[in-house]
Amino acid sequence: MSPKVIAICLVALLLPISISHGGRIGPIEPSKASSKVVERGNYDGRVEGCEEDDCLVERLLVAHLDYIYTQGKHN
């Protein structure tokens, strides 16, 4: 076989392996995991000690989850 065919076969074999390895999500380190828990009904939209972007993300996440979990009550 020519070197070009061998190289193409090698790339074709290694590419799926590298793609699947790159897509894996490893365990989250406990120091990086957020331990904030928002009780339903007790959230007033403010998060202490966060920057503007972090607060926006937090509020959007809570609003989205509230929207998801209240859909069954309206149908």
Swiss-Prot record:
Intracellular or extracellular location(s): Secreted
Propeptide feature: residues: 23-66, 72-75
First and last residue of the signal peptide: 1-22
Location (main, coarse): secreted
Any one Pfam family match given in the protein's UniProt record, by short name: PSK
GO molecular function per UniProt: growth factor activity
Entry keywords, A to Z: Developmental protein, Differentiation, Growth factor, Secreted, Signal, Sulfation
Keyword Signal on entry: yes
Coiled coil regions, renumbered to chain: none
A single GO BP: cell differentiation
Keyword check for Methyltransferase: no
InterPro entries: Phytosulfokine
Modified residues (Sulfotyrosine): Y67, Y69
Post-translational modification as stated in the protein's UniProt record: Sulfation is important for activity and for the binding to a putative membrane receptor.
Role summary: Promotes plant cell differentiation, organogenesis and somatic embryogenesis as well as cell proliferation.
Family: Belongs to the phytosulfokine family.
Stated name of the protein: Phytosulfokines 3
